[in-house]
Amino acid sequence: MADQVQDVHPMEWGPGKTPQGRARLPSSFDATVKDPVAAVHSENLVCRVPMHRIRHLESLVYDLMQNSSANVNQEQVGVTPSPGDQPHVPDYPTPSAAHAPSTNQEPASAAVSPADYGSMQSTGGGANYVGSAHWAAVLDGIAELKDHLDNEESHHSDSQGVDPPCLQVTGPQLLYGCPKPADKDEILSSIPARSVVDRLVSRYFNSFEMSPAVLHSVQFLKEYEEFWEDPQTTSPIWLGLLFTIMCLATQFEKSRLDPGVQSPAVLSMERELQEMVDTFRLRIPQCLVLGSYAKGGPFVLETLMLYIAAEIFLSNDAEIEIWILMGNTVQLALHMGYHRDPKHFKGLSPFTAEMRRRIWATIVEMDLGLSAQMGLPRMIKHWQTDTQEPSNFQDSDFDSATVEMPPSRLNTDLTPILYRLVKARLMTTIGYIWDFSADVRPYPYTEVQKMDDKLDQARKSIPECLKWHSMARNITDSPQHIMQKVILETVFYRAKIVLHRKYMFLPLAQSASSRRIVLESALKLLDYQHMLQEETQPFCQLYQERWRVSSLVNHDFLLATSILCYYLQHARGATPQLSESASFDETIMTSLSRSHDIWLQSSNSSKEARKVVRALAVILGRVNTPSADAAGESGLVFGLQSTYPPSTTNDYSQAPMITPTAEWQEMDGQSQWLPGPRVIQRLTYDMQRQQMRWGL
C-alpha cells in the first residue's frame, strides 16, 4: 500500500523522460538540438508524426493515469498516512503542528496529471520551470494547444531574428554589475534642481501606497533636508534611495500622459520623462555598489525594495531577474535579523523596532507575490520568523524620539499603513496555501477544506473600509482606495484557484465543490479584469491609476484565463461527464471572449499576453483570425499605450546622461541637471493642496 501511494510522486525525470520516468511521447520531442543537421532531421520527423495519433496516445495515457489515481484514492480511504508522507500544514500560529486526518475521514489525494508536476520549457540558455499552479503550466497541460503554441512561438521567434550576444543587458542592472561605475560627484551631478526633486518626492508619497511601509515620511524629510544642506556627506546608499523615489515618481508622472494625444508637445514631454527614468534607473545600482550594499546597513533594504518596485512597473511580463534580486533582498534581510522580532534585542528604539516590522512584513509580501508570479516556491518560510506585524499608526504618531509607542489605532481608522497591514494578514494565509500547493507530497482533501476555511476567515476580517462591494458603491472613494480594494479581492480569488485546482477533476464527490469554487473564482477575476479595462479608459474613475495594473496584477488574470481554458478542454473531451451546465459553459465562453480582446491589445508588448491570446484563439475557435502579431502597433494595456516599450525600457547601455532637452545650471558651486521646461511645468503643483497625507 505504501508503495502504491509513493508512486503518485515522481522519483526521477529528465531529458527524454516524463515525470514518471517513462519515455516521452512524440509530442514531447526536445526542441533544443545542438547539431544543426540533427535539428533538421528532428524537425522533419516531428512533421511526419500525425498529430491526431499523438493526441490519441496522450488521451489514452491520461485516461490510464486518471484510473490509476482513482484506484489509489479508493485504497487510501480509511488509511492514515505515515508521518513521512503527511503534508506539513501547520495550524496558525504553531509552525510545527501537522494535521493527521482521523481514520474515519477520507484522506483523498489530488488527481495526478502531467500538469501536476509543473512545466519545463527548454530555451537557448537552459530550461525554465514553473509549478503546477502557474498559468503557463495550466496552458501547457492542454493537449490541443501544444502544437499551436509551439508553432506560433517558433514563428514569432524567427520573425524577431536572433539577438546579438552580449550587446544589451535587460532587467535589473545590479545583477550584472555596473557598466559605468560612477563616483559620488558624478552621481550628484545627475540630481535635478531641488524644485524638481521636491515635486517628485511629493508625487511619490502621494501616489505610492507602499511608501509608508518602507519609509517614515517625517524621518525621511529630516534626512532630505540634511542632504540639501551638505550633499557631499550623504551616504551613497541614501542617494540610491533618493534615485529610486525619483525613478518611481517619474514613472507615475509619465503614466498620467494621455496616450491618445500624440501632439509634438506631448511626445517631447514623454521623451524627456523617459530620459529621466533611464538616468535615475542607472544611478540606483551605481549607488548601491558604491555603498557596498552587500554588507547591509542603513537604507539598504529600503533602496532594494523600491528598486524592485521600479523594475516591476517597467516590466510588461514576469522577469526572472526581478525574482533573483528579491532573493538577494531576502538574504540581506535575514543577515540583518529582520526575521526575528525586535523585542528579543535590547538597544533597538521603539521607532526602529516599528520600522523593522513594517519593512519585514513588506518583504514577506513581495517574496510571495513575485514567487507566485514566477510559479516557484517562496523563499521565506513561516517557521523561520517570529516578527510581529506592525501597528496601525499615522507617521505623526511616532518618530525617532519616541520613548514608548502609543496604542495602535483601530482597524476602522483608515491610515496610510492600514492597507499594507490588511494585505499582509491576508497574504499570511495565502502564503500557507502557496506552500501547501508547492508541497510535492500528496495531501488529504480534509486539509484543503481547512485551508479554505482559513482563507474565508481572513477575508471576513478585512475592515469594512477596505471591503469591495461594487463600483457603484465606490464612486465617492479615491481611485487609489478603489484599487486597494480590488487588489485584495484578486489575491483572494487567486488563492482559491491555487488551493482547489488539483481537485477539479478528482473522481470523488468533493471534486464538484472544488471545481465550482475554481471556476467561479476564475470568472470573478475576469470580471475584475473587464471592470479595470473599462474604468481605466479616459474620463473614467481609474484612468490616472492605470499604471497600477502591473504584471503582478495581470498574473492573476492570466491564471484565471488559463484555468477556464483548461476546464473547457476537459468538458469537451477527456471528461465531459464532469462538466457544468451548458449555460454555465456559455458564460465562461463569453467571459473568455471579452478577455481575449483585452489580451490582444497588449500582445505586441507582452509575450505572456501573446501566448494566452493564441491559446484563447484555439479554445474560442478563432484560429484563422488575425494573430497576436497583427494586433496593431498600439501596444495597448487596458486601453492605454504600453508606457515603456521593450526597445527602450531595459537598455541600460543607452541610458542618457545628458539630453538635448535637458538644461544645466550652477547651484552651490555644482553643476546640476535640470529637466526641460515642459517637464518642470508638468510637475508644478500647489504644495499646500497636495500636502502629504501622513499626518503632517
UniProtKB/Swiss-Prot annotation:
Pfam families: Fungal_trans. One of its GO terms (molecular function) is zinc ion binding. Keywords: Nucleus. One of its GO terms (cellular component) is nucleus. Residues 1-24, 73-117 are annotated as: Disordered. GO terms for biological process: DNA-templated transcription. It comes from the Eukaryota. Its main location: nucleus. This is Equisetin cluster transcription factor eqxF.
